[in-house]
Amino acid sequence: MRTFWIVAVLLVGVEGNLLQFNKMIKIMTKKNAIPFYTSYGCYCGWGGRGRPKDATDRCCFVHDCCYEKLTDCSPKTARYSYSWKSGVIICGEGTPCEKQICECDRAAAVCFGANLSTYKKRYMFYPDLLCTDPSEKC
């Protein structure tokens, strides 16, 4: 189901933060978010439940929690400014929402980069129905 929503969003041409987040992931991991992070484990992609499968999946869990803490923001579509130099992502100026969304995405991209060694192909396109453990709280 997560994969369906991700593809649907991409087909309608979202130009906001999801594409910016993909670029951050590419900077930090040298991998495209699609297919490597869009439906990985129990939390990477749309929604999430259960326990994160590994450190990479935990990056997505923490990212979801970061988005949940944003009130009156549109984290999946709002655009923000950022730059990078020598592999360091720097969130730029903008509204408080834009800055917070950028920081959530930056932290997740950095987390993915720091945990590349935990990435397991067996968790790519992981079925939601296998995410049955009790969910953790943010």
Swiss-Prot record:
Q: What GO molecular-function term can you cite, just one? A: phospholipase A2 activity
Catalytic function, reaction form = a 1,2-diacyl-sn-glycero-3-phosphocholine + H2O = a 1-acyl-sn-glycero-3-phosphocholine + a fatty acid + H(+)
The family database entries (SUPFAM superfamilies) matched by this protein are listed as: Phospholipase A2, PLA2
The processes (GO biological process) annotated in the record are:
lipid catabolic process
Q: How is the cofactor bound?
A: Binds 1 Ca(2+) ion.
EC identifiers of the protein: 3.1.1.4
Domain of life the protein comes from = Eukaryota
An annotated GO cellular component: extracellular region
Q: Which UniProt keywords apply?
A: Calcium, Disulfide bond, Hydrolase, Lipid degradation, Lipid metabolism, Metal-binding, Myotoxin, Secreted, Signal, Toxin
UniProt entry tagged with the keyword Hydrolase: yes
**Subcellular location(s) of the protein:** Secreted
The positions annotated for binding Ca(2+) are Y43, G45, G47, D64
Complexes and interactors:
Monomer.
Outline what the protein does: Snake venom phospholipase A2 (PLA2) that shows myotoxic activities. PLA2 catalyzes the calcium-dependent hydrolysis of the 2-acyl groups in 3-sn-phosphoglycerides.
Q: What is this protein called?
A: Basic phospholipase A2 Cll-N6
Source organism per entry reads: Crotalus lepidus lepidus (Mottled rock rattlesnake)
